[in-house]
């Protein structure tokens, strides 16, 4: 039976940390891309967006000037 020493465990945790960071970055990129696409699709109709969930409120307001 082979036992892992502390060096093996720390290498495992370092690889796992890189793995989780990679997926967190991919998730953040997906959220940003979704928000960007949503705003491009609804840019003419979107002036204000409110999201209420529990104690959290997210409010987005677009401020722009009309072209002359």
UniProtKB/Swiss-Prot annotation:
Keywords: Cell inner membrane, Cell membrane, Membrane, Plasmid, Toxin-antitoxin system, Transmembrane, Transmembrane helix. InterPro entries: Hok/gef_toxin (IPR000021), Hok/gef_toxin_CS (IPR018084). The keyword Cell membrane applies. It is found in: Cell inner membrane. The chain crosses the membrane at residues 23-42. Belongs to the Hok/Gef family. Toxic component of a type I toxin-antitoxin (TA) system. Its normal function is believed to be effective plasmid stabilization through postsegregational killing of cells that have lost the F plasmid. Promotes degradation of stable RNA in E.coli. This is Protein SrnB. The lineage of its organism: Bacteria, Pseudomonadati, Pseudomonadota, Gammaproteobacteria, Enterobacterales.
């Amino acid at each position: 039976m082979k036992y892992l020493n502390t060096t093996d465990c720390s290498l495992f945790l370092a690889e796992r940390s890189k793995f989780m960071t990679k997926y967190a970055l991919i998730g953040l990129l997906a959220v940003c891309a979704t928000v960007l696409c949503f705003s491009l699709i609804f840019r003419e109709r979107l002036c204000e967006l409110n999201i209420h969930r529990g104690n959290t409120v997210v409010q987005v307001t677009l401020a722009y000037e009309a072209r002359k």
